[in-house]
Regions:
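N-terminal targeting signals for export/organelle localization
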Residues: 1-13, 126, 147
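A short beta-strand-turn-helix
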Residues: 10-31, 54
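Loop/turn elements at helix/coil->beta-strand transitions in domains of secreted/extracellular proteins
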Residues: 26-31, 60-63, 88-91, 123
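Short pre-active-site segment immediately N-terminal to redox-active cysteine/selenocysteine motifs
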Residues: 29-31, 36-39, 71
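Conserved redox-active cysteine motifs that mediate thiol-disulfide chemistry
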Residues: 35-52
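Structural microenvironment flanking redox-active thiols in thiol-disulfide oxidoreductases
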Residues: 47-86, 98-105
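Short, internal strand/loop/helix patches
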Residues: 82-115, 123
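Thiol-/selenol-based redox modules, centered on thioredoxin-like
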Residues: 115-147
């Protein structure tokens, strides 16, 4: 029996105009925004660390947002099954905006566009990282914001 199980959970897709408010929330929380894709091995390797942060620090006012740069044609074949397989609990959104010359520098002036990339911010304090994290490194960065 080869019935295909269709992933029915809602996957919100944003362009930059839709994403921009989500990466500039003005409240007391520490916001962690990670840009990743299922085809990016270093991204996949560090996803459990973001899940750990989400699980461990959500009660301390830390909010994790995973922004997938997977191609739209792969949402059903790769992204949704990946989220289901690894039981991702953090909020995942898909980002689809072909105007890279606009949104890459808008997200951060020093960003080359390479992933993984992460923004951690709280109010006006903002850090941008174009690199991978170990679990320990990511936790240290979060704790710096929570001080």
């Amino acid at each position: 029996d080869n019935d295909v199980i269709v992933d029915t959970f809602k996957l919100d897709v944003y362009d930059y105009d839709g994403l921009e408010p989500l990466i500039n929330i003005k409240d007391d929380k520490v916001h962690v925004v990670n840009f990743w894709a299922t085809w990016c091995a270093p991204c996949v390797k560090e996803l459990p660390y973001f899940e750990y942060i989400n699980e461990t620090f959500k009660d301390k006012g830390v909010d994790v947002l995973l922004v997938s740069l997977d191609f739209p044609k792969n949402y059903d074949s790769k992204l949704r099954p990946f989220i289901r397989k690894y039981d991702i609990k953090s909020k995942v959104i898909a980002f689809d905006d072909t105007d890279q010359n606009r949104w890459i520098p808008a997200i951060h002036k020093d960003w080359s566009g390479a992933i993984p990339a992460t923004i951690i911010y709280q109010g006006d304090k903002r850090q941008f990282y174009e690199r991978s994290f170990t679990k320990e490194e990511l936790e240290i960065e979060i704790l710096r914001f929570l001080r």
